[in-house]
């Protein structure tokens, strides 16, 4: 499995609009096991996006999907900047099957 955790900082006062734009644009994304958008309770303009994919290749391929490209274009004016970004190797959890290591 392949994971990503990233911080986005919305333009001042645009966090909820950014969240609506992102969530409204989520469509069928082959290989996406989990995609969660969360508000940062300590910063009124920050959101965190946590993704779990079956592989890095599925994530890269998703960026070429028309619905994803359209969502990115609609979200760009609402984003002030990007904060931290981390790649992870999810081992499992609620809603995600545990990875079996061989």
Briefly describe each language-model feature range.
Residues 2-8, 36-63:
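Short, well-ordered beta-strand segments in beta-rich or mixed alpha/beta enzyme
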Residues 7-18:
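Short, surface-exposed ligand-recognition loops at beta-strand->loop->(often short) alpha-helix junctions
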Residues 13, 32, 42-44:
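A generic structural motif
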Residues 19, 33-35:
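Short structured motifs
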Residues 24-33, 52-87:
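An amphipathic, aromatic/His-enriched active-site/gating alpha helix that lines ligand/cofactor pockets
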């Amino acid at each position: 499995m392949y994971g990503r955790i990233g911080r986005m900082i919305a333009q001042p006062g645009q966090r909820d609009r950014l969240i609506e734009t992102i969530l409204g644009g989520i469509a069928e994304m082959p290989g996406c096991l989990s995609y969660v958008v969360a508000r940062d309770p300590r910063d009124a303009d920050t959101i965190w996006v946590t993704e779990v994919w079956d592989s890095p290749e599925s994530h890269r391929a998703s960026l070429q999907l028309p619905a994803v490209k359209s969502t990115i274009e609609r979200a760009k004016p609402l984003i002030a900047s990007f904060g931290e970004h981390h790649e992870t190797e999810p081992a499992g959890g609620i809603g995600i099957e545990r990875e079996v290591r061989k």
